From Swiss-Prot:
A Pfam cross-reference name: AP2
Record's protein name: Ethylene-responsive transcription factor 13
Annotated family: Belongs to the AP2/ERF transcription factor family. ERF subfamily.
Gene: ERF13
Organism name: Arabidopsis thaliana (Mouse-ear cress)
Nuclear localization signal, short sequence motif: residues: 96-112
UniProt key word Transcription: yes
Main subcellular location of this protein, as a coarse class: nucleus
Entries under InterPro entries matching the protein: AP2/ERF_dom, AP2/ERF_dom_sf, DNA-bd_dom_sf, ERF_plant
Amino acid sequence: MSSSDSVNNGVNSRMYFRNPSFSNVILNDNWSDLPLSVDDSQDMAIYNTLRDAVSSGWTPSVPPVTSPAEENKPPATKASGSHAPRQKGMQYRGVRRRPWGKFAAEIRDPKKNGARVWLGTYETPEDAAVAYDRAAFQLRGSKAKLNFPHLIGSCKYEPVRIRPRRRSPEPSVSDQLTSEQKRESHVDDGESSLVVPELDFTVDQFYFDGSLLMDQSECSYSDNRI
């Protein structure tokens, strides 16, 4: 059994703490194990009081010992309401995960009997949640239940929407025009001119042979004389 001196309101008092063999020490009169003096009347009075209490079945209780670090530690406050941080993997309002890993935002329009209105597909659930918040605020105003109410009206955060990829590039206007459509009239400096396609004329050389023409003319002349 051990003791420690403390000052309480200017009066010295002695505190005693429990020892596993406390009862045996008092009942067996093992004075050497007690921090009491036989010559001190006050110590003897304390000893007699403790002995009577132990004989009646009383055992001292040990108060819980707390370290200084635990005493100075502030109590943990539980976050609640809309300001509570979202846990990882938590489902946001108006956000659904696509099978391929992207996140779609949608909202029910009360003006269309609660029909779902698709708001787009996004890379992260936070972007989809912000897109839902903006649509919900436009539909319901201050009564809307939002995922991030502190971002409403802020232009600092802009959700990135995924644009669908085109399967094939769109053909240009020049590719769509055929050769016939290219041969059209155009206006140049106020005067209209018609673009005429080149024509391929195939001429038989027989009709342009000079000797043959002379032979034909002589035959026709002789025929006239006869």
